[in-house]
């Protein structure tokens, strides 16, 4: 139960391209209950949630945040196979966007205020980073927090000489005190601010602190998190986040001033429209609200920013390339064009990788040796007992084994 005397924290779940949801939820809180954000002790974030927490604390304009998210979606959808295309480098997109948009004193603004969830590669443990000494450190930490193994690349980036990957691998909804932390997630589950669905299905799972209801709606959302849909569909997540945050405020009696009740309309119905037809308990990513009056309660600022971000800024060449006959032809030519594009992308990445190639190769050698050693210990128990005896003998003579772990700069190849 909400206690107005407490200072609350907020935790934003990692969600890939679904970060639009966090934008809508935060805007609702800032308009309807600004004291929650103004007096917040800490902002926690993982992956896209960490990106949102940093941009919010830095007071980036809403229009700029929407522009960054929409540009990232457009880049991901600009190729035939989307985010899997070799020309799409999500690490570079995130790094370039952060370097361009974040203020130079971002490390001073967010230190002690924002906790970024990372997963340390060496032991798989979760690490919360909250102190930064430069803008580059903030960018490195955010790139590490967004690095999905294999999907984002083969070699993990580094932060302060240590390799890290997506914080969602170990803790996707980081909290220090669950009783005083408001959790925000775009997935159907049991978090404070998240989509709700009326259904007889009560099954849900908890994966690295992320609560997921077992429903087709979450399956679609998980797919959209890695393979974004059209910009209009992704933009609608802002409205979903805004309404879910409003429902949370209403249920806990936090709203400033009298507000119109939305409790009957904010819960997604058991049957939603898909292509004009009712489909069981399926809740698609495209929102299905039954009360048109809901839209009157939405923030004019959000509606304006979203409409502006969705506007088509493509030139005539892009419009021609998006014509159905041209797209069909491009798919037919894909078996021939993809190998050539892959070779070009590989050469380009190799050239940009050259400054870090020595450190990264050393790390790959160390990682390979660790994997081989663990496999050997699992397959040959005698080796495990012999290694234990050797360690005991070394400790007895005052020696402490310390495996060599070369560290390098961020790579993300």
UniProtKB/Swiss-Prot annotation:
Induction trigger: Up-regulated in response to high-sucrose diet.
Topological domains, Cytoplasmic: 1-42
GO CC annotations, alphabetized: lipid droplet; membrane
Subcellular localization: Membrane; Lipid droplet
GO biological process: glycerophospholipid metabolic process; long-chain fatty acid metabolic process; phosphatidic acid biosynthetic process; response to dietary excess; triglyceride biosynthetic process; triglyceride catabolic process
Tissue spec. comment: Restricted to adipose tissue. Expressed in inguinal and epididymal white adipose tissues and in interscapular brown adipose tissue. Also expressed in liver in response to high-sucrose diet.
Active site: 47 (nucleophile), 166 (proton acceptor)
Impact reported for residue 148 to M: Increases 1-acylglycerol-3-phosphate O-acyltransferase activity 2-fold; promotes hepatic lipid synthesis
Transmembrane segments: 43-63
Keywords: Acyltransferase, Glycoprotein, Hydrolase, Lipid biosynthesis, Lipid droplet, Lipid metabolism, Membrane, Phospholipid biosynthesis, Phospholipid metabolism, Signal-anchor, Transferase, Transmembrane, Transmembrane helix
Chief location category: membrane
Glycan-modified residues: 206, 209
Placement of sequence motif GXSXG: 45-49
UniProt name for this protein: 1-acylglycerol-3-phosphate O-acyltransferase Pnpla3
Native source species: Mus musculus
Taxonomic placement: Eukaryota, Metazoa, Chordata, Craniata, Vertebrata
UniProt gene name: Pnpla3
């Amino acid at each position: 139960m909400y206690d107005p005397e407490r200072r609350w924290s907020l935790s934003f779940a990692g969600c890939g391209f679904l970060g639009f949801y966090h934008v809508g939820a935060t805007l609702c809180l800032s308009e309807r209950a600004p004291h929650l954000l103004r007096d917040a002790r800490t902002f926690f974030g993982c992956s896209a949630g960490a990106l949102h927490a940093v941009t919010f604390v830095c007071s980036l304009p809403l229009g700029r945040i929407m522009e960054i998210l929409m540009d990232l979606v457009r880049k991901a959808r600009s190729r035939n196979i989307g985010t899997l295309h070799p020309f799409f480098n999500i690490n570079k997109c995130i790094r370039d966007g952060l370097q361009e948009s974040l203020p130079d004193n971002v490390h001073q603004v967010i230190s002690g205020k924002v906790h970024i969830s990372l997963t340390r590669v060496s032991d798989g443990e979760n690490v919360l980073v909250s102190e930064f000494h430069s803008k580059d450190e903030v960018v490195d930490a955010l790139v590490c927090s967004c690095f999905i193994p294999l999907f984002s690349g083969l070699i993990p980036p580094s932060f302060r000489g240590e390799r890290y990957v997506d914080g969602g691998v170990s803790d996707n909804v980081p909290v220090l005190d669950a009783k005083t932390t408001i959790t925000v997630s775009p997935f159907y589950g049991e978090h404070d601010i998240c989509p709700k669905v009326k259904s007889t299905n009560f099954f849900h799972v908890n994966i690295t602190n992320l609560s997921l209801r077992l429903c087709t709606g979450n399956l679609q959302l998980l797919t959209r998190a890695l393979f974004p849909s059209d910009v209009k569909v992704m933009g609608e997540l802002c409205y979903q986040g805004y309404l879910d945050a409003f429902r949370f405020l209403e249920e806990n009696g936090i709203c400033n001033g009298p507000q119109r009740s939305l409790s009957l309309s904010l819960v997604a119905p058991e049957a939603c429209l898909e292509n004009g037809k009712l489909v069981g308990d399926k809740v698609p990513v495209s929102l299905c609200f039954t009360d048109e009056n809901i839209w009157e309660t939405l923030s004019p600022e959000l509606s304006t920013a979203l409409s502006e971000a969705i506007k088509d800024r493509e030139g005539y060449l892009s419009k021609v390339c998006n014509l159905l006959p041209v797209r069909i032809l491009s798919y037919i030519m894909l078996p021939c064009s993809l190998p050539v594009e892959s070779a070009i992308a590989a050469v380009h990445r190799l050239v940009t990788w050259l400054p870090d190639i020595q450190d990264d190769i050393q790390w790959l050698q160390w990682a390979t040796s660790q994997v081989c050693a663990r496999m050997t210990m699992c397959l040959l128990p005698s080796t495990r007992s012999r290694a234990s005896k050797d360690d005991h003998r070394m400790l007895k003579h005052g020696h402490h084994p310390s495996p060599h772990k070369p560290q390098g700069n961020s790579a993300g190849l």
